[in-house]
């Protein structure tokens, strides 16, 4: 994995919040995913499923980083250029795995 400048603890907190808010997927994109970030660059996340709005609030308030987050909801209509960027450079941080109960 390339250097994205985010501590493992913060990634773990993002995953825990994704599970808490029943998200299907969390994708890191932007300068951190590309590896050309600056020390104070924000953390760009694209999310789908669940309660994306509350995830966006909690990720700002409950993670142990001073970095800012920019969260976009993939379930809403987004500009095609932004979607292409997410698909091209995105790194999946979390994806819900479905369990079959027989």
State the predicted function of each range.
Residues 1-25, 33-39, 48-102:
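Catalytic core of pol beta-like nucleotidyltransferases
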């Amino acid at each position: 994995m390339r250097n994205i400048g985010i501590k493992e603890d913060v990634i773990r907190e993002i995953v825990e919040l994704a599970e808490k808010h029943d998200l299907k997927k969390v994708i890191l994109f932007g300068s951190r995913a590309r590896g050309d970030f600056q020390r104070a660059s924000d953390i760009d996340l694209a999310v789908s499923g669940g309660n994306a709005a509350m995830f966006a609030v909690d990720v700002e308030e409950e993670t142990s980083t001073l970095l800012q987050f920019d969260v976009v909801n993939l379930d809403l209509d987004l500009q095609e250029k932004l979607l292409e960027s997410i698909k091209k450079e995105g790194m999946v941080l979390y994806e819900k795995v479905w369990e079959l109960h027989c």
